[in-house]
Swiss-Prot record:
It holds the Pfam family RVT_1. One of its GO terms (molecular function) is RNA binding. It comes from Vibrio cholerae serotype O1 biovar El Tor. It catalyses: DNA(n) + a 2'-deoxyribonucleoside 5'-triphosphate = DNA(n+1) + diphosphate. This is Retron Vc95 reverse transcriptase. Its EC number is 2.7.7.49. The gene is ret. Residues 19-244 form the Reverse transcriptase domain. One of its GO terms (biological process) is defense response to virus. Mg(2+) binds at residues 102, 190-191.
Length: 315
């Protein structure tokens, strides 16, 4: 399959984009981004590069074309149909010991060089000219200089697939190592989690992970050592924002429960605006997915079926 030819045919046949617009994006697509920032969950701000409407259409079609061609490892839980942060946490819920690690500036660390390596590993062979055009459709040029560095953007619809595909070699090797030593391994985007019931088994993993990352990506992707955390049943264990309980279950955690309860109380007393009500509905839906028994208890606390009504969208 010629990827660019297939993409062009899909877009032009359906009059989704004009020929000259597509040709322009093949040459300067990496410049067609709107850039803004949003606050991070704990501190600082995250830069989002959002593709133009035409480029986004191209990327969505390209995503559909590449998806069946690129291997994604079974240990990957983010951006995979039928999987969620809940599924990711459940893998580790029966383990006493947990190790969490994190890739630094993950999406923006992924470059055309890494993608080219990934395409070859998936038996996708393109000419230099085809590769350059494909890279213009996938990557973002923050500097907007003629030969500026291209990186994967947070905000592009094709970035999740590319990020999972380029991690396949790492995921496979590290998962094989873990399987031999009775360790569970999952990756949720840039968050990697290891767990086991065998004491001290996780101690050497950070060094193994760092060495493998260097070997596989030549230093382009690195570990954020400040976020490497060991935990056990003696301490609070969290995986992708979900609490692991000592009875091998998952929970939204005490602080979230108190927060959600306060939102419902304010809602009953008509002290929430529209945005806050929508936020509360999202939190309730999240809690129902992770820990439905909590929603049942919350309903009993407020006696009337106010919580069920909120979840159903009733006023």
């Amino acid at each position: 399959m010629n990827i660019l030819t297939t993409l062009r045919e899909q877009l032009l046949t359906n009059n989704v984009i004009m020929p000259q617009e597509f040709e322009r994006l093949e040459v300067r697509g990496s410049h067609a981004y709107k850039v803004y920032s949003i606050p991070k969950r704990k501190a600082g701000r995250r830069t989002i590069a959002h593709p133009s409407s035409k480029l986004k259409i191209c990327q969505r079609h390209l995503n559909a074309i590449l998806n069946p061609l690129l291997k994604v490892h079974d240990s990957s839980y983010a951006y995979v149909k039928g999987r969620s942060i809940k599924d990711n946490a459940l893998v580790h819920s029966h383990s006493a010991y947990v190790l969490k690690m994190d890739f630094q500036n993950f999406f923006n660390s992924i470059t055309p060089t890494i993608l080219r390596q990934c395409l070859i590993q998936n038996d996708i062979l393109l000419s230099v000219n085809e590769l350059e055009k494909l890279e213009q459709l996938i990557f973002w040029n923050p500097s907007k200089k003629r030969n500026g560095k291209l990186i994967l953007s947070v905000g592009s619809p094709i970035s999740p697939l590319i990020s999972n595909a380029i991690m396949y070699p790492f995921d496979k090797i590290i998962n094989d190592i873990c399987t031999k030593h009775g360790i569970n391994y999952t990756r949720y985007a840039d968050d990697i989690t290891f767990s086991t019931n065998i004491k001290n088994t996780l101690n050497k993993l950070p060094e193994i992970v760092e060495q493998l990352i260097i070997q596989t990506y030549a230093g382009r992707i690195i570990i954020n050592k400040r976020k490497t955390v060991f935990s056990s049943k003696k301490h609070n264990r969290h995986v992708t924002g979900i609490t692991l309980t000592n009875d091998s279950k998952i929970s939204i955690g005490r602080s979230r429960k108190r927060y959600i309860s306060s939102l419902v109380f304010k809602y009953i007393n008509k002290n929430l605006d529209i945005d806050e009500i929508n936020h509360m509905k999202g939190m309730l839906a999240f809690a129902y997915n992770i820990e439905p028994i909590y929603i049942h208890r919350l309903s009993h606390k407020y006696k009337v079926n106010i919580v069920e009504k909120i979840l159903r969208g009733s006023n």
